[in-house]
From Swiss-Prot:
Topology Extracellular: residue spans: 39-76, 171-173, 277-292
Effect caused by changing Y50A: Abolishes stimulation of ATPase activity by lipid-linked oligosaccharide binding and decreases translocation of lipid-linked oligosaccharide
Listed Gene3D superfamilies: ABC transporter type 1, transmembrane domain, P-loop containing nucleotide triphosphate hydrolases
Organism (species): Campylobacter jejuni subsp. jejuni serotype O:2 (strain ATCC 700819 / NCTC 11168)
Main location group: membrane
Protein name: Protein glycosylation K
Classification of source organism: Bacteria, Pseudomonadati, Campylobacterota, Epsilonproteobacteria, Campylobacterales
Membrane topology designation: Multi-pass membrane protein
Length: 564
């Protein structure tokens, strides 16, 4: 567990974790010292004669030159001040504990999200979107809870060990008996409850995975659900997983309460036993054992919550262990390491003996060859599933050939120059996603807003008239997924987004297939008009959209056949 946790945490986090562990040891000494002070205080307060019998107390009384009761009062006040200091120190420690454990949610979520953004495209296409969302949200939060439980476990172990040492010094016989009795009961608790917690943790992880899957799938098919009136069926699926998730958490919470209830009862019985044992042993001098009884009462008062926290924290480690495994596996994914080498595209792009197949599947292409000249407009046609989009993904550098190479002006496309090459490409997909922000933000897509460039691409994409009639202009919100816009308006925003990057190559992946023939023809005319000097690659189903292309290739059985 520690190996995986240290892999996930940064160097700064590990250093702070070490500091917290050292601080917890210091807190443990303070706790033990605070309890140890109670015994002499009660002893002296119950019998002033100690100041006449103990040479150190005699010297102290002579040095202070004040009545004994005043010494006891000052001792009591000092004890109160020390306990207040102890309480403040504990509060500060738990603040640091919460800041570290819950603060890791941000740091680890950022690392996991960054990892997903930086894995290669082929690996990403094999991921389940709901799994990614679950990892970044639920599993990372669970891991932060697990870290908190781990630190609390270590802190309480230190407290228990030091208090145990103190109790051994006071009365080793009672302490040894107490140890055997408590360890035996704790062992029974752990053996009985741990399997229940583990099974609940597995059920929680499985239910959570299905929970996110159902949400993701059905929210993306809302129109179909409404049309087919499938609400009841969807709710039934959601209810089953939501209940499974709740039941797993109920089991965990219920089992977590058992150690406290059980140990409180056992602790009370042990306390009564200690008092009875000491009274029977010292029948003639009850006042002499008052301090011993007091110290054991205080020690047990502090040990019972510690024992409960240790068992509960251990159960949390078991319950959330799957979250640690999931985050660890996510962060171990190999990243796409791209260099900053420049790549010029002034003459032509060559595909030489290219072969490709997705991992674990047969090759889609074998020994494919193709030349695309700078400024040329080409189209790929073919049956659905023949590999048109995959071929384009290879051409634009998202996928890497298994065999063969892609040459840009006779320079091989590789990890060193792919990043620069991708920046030369404007991409308009079939399924356009607009986020719930302004038109301007959707066009610039995270880049700084250049008003001159923004106005130019709005004009090029024929959005000028539409935006002028909007009360808020380019600051108008488009709605989630562009729900406030028509299909044609979304398409034009996607075109403006692609043009804003000032690309040298424009790629349309069935970008107008969702439009009617008239709208499609109009938008394609606009695209051809504004892309005179750009290289264009088009994937199309309708031949009417590619009449102005220089070349048309049909992809069939992994082979390209020129049709124009």
């Amino acid at each position: 567990m520690l190996k995986k946790l240290f892999f996930i945490l940064s160097k700064e986090d590990k250093n702070f974790l070490f500091f917290l562990l050292v601080f917890s040891v210091f807190i443990s000494f303070i706790e033990t010292f605070a309890i140890s002070l109670v015994m002499p205080f009660i002893t002296l307060a119950s019998d002033f004669s100690y100041f006449d019998r103990n040479k150190y107390l005699i010297s102290l009384k002579e040095y202070l030159n004040i009545p004994v009761f005043e010494i006891i009062v000052y001792f009591g006040v000092g004890l109160i001040v020390f306990y207040v200091f102890r309480a403040l120190l504990n509060a500060y420690y738990f603040h640091l504990l919460a800041r570290f454990s819950k603060g890791r949610y941000h740091a680890i979520a950022y690392k996991v999200f960054s990892k997903f953004l930086n894995i290669n495209y082929e690996k990403f296409t094999q991921k389940n979107q709901s799994e990614i969302l679950k990892s970044i949200t639920g599993e990372v939060y669970n891991l932060s809870t697990m870290i908190s439980s781990f630190l609390l476990l270590m802190s309480e172990i230190f407290v228990v060990l030091l208090l145990y040492a103190l109790m051994l010094l006071i009365n080793y016989k009672i302490t040894l008996f107490l140890s055997i009795f408590m360890v035996l009961n704790a062992f029974i608790l752990v053996k009985i409850l741990s399997p229940i917690i583990k099974k609940a943790g597995v059920r929680r992880e499985e239910a959570m995975k299905n929970f996110f899957e159902i949400l993701n799938t059905n929210l993306n098919n809302f129109k179909f659900i409404k049309l087919k009136t499938k609400e009841d069926g969807v709710l039934s699926l959601f209810k089953a997983q939501s209940e499974a998730f709740s039941k797993a958490n109920i089991t965990n919470e219920s089992v977590a309460a058992v150690p406290r209830i059980y140990l409180e009862g056992i602790g009370f019985c042990v306390l009564v036993f200690i008092v009875v044992f000491l009274v029977l042993k010292n029948e003639s001098d009850i006042s002499g054992i008052l301090s011993t009884i007091s110290i054991f009462v205080l020690a047990l008062y502090r040990l019972m919550p510690s024992a409960n926290r240790i068992i509960t924290s251990y159960h949390d480690l078991l319950y959330y262990h799957s979250s640690l495994d999931i985050i660890y596996q996510n962060l171990r994914q190999e990243e796409e390491n791209l260099g900053e080498e420049k790549l010029s595209f002034n003459q032509e792009l060559k595909i030489c003996n290219l072969s490709f197949g997705y991992e674990g599947k047969k090759y889609l292409f074998k020994n494919l060859n193709l030349n695309i000249k700078k400024g040329e407009k080409i189209a790929f046609i073919g049956e659905s599933g023949c590999g048109k989009s995959t071929l384009v993904d290879l051409i634009i550098g998202l996928l890497k050939p298994k065999e063969g190479q892609i040459l840009i002006d006779e320079q091989e496309l590789n990890a060193n120059n792919t990043k620069n090459y991708r920046q030369k490409i404007g991409y308009i997909p079939q399924n356009i996603y607009l986020f719930n922000d302004s038109i301007a933000k959707n066009i610039t897509f995270g880049d700084a807003v250049d008003e001159e460039k923004l106005n130019r691409v709005i004009k090029q994409a024929n959005l000028e008239h539409f935006i002028k009639n909007l009360p808020q202009g380019v600051q108008t919100k488009v709605g989630d997924g562009g729900s406030n816009l028509s299909g044609g308006q979304k398409q034009r925003i996607a075109i403006a987004r692609a043009l804003y990057l000032e690309p040298e190559m424009l790629v349309l992946d069935e970008a107008t297939s969702a439009l009617d023939t008239q709208s499609e023809a109009k938008i394609m005319d606009e695209i051809y008009k504004i892309s005179k000097d750009k290289t264009m690659i088009i994937i199309a189903h309708r031949l009417s959209t590619i009449t102005q292309c220089d070349k048309v290739y049909r992809l069939e059985h992994g082979k390209l056949k020129e049709e124009k």
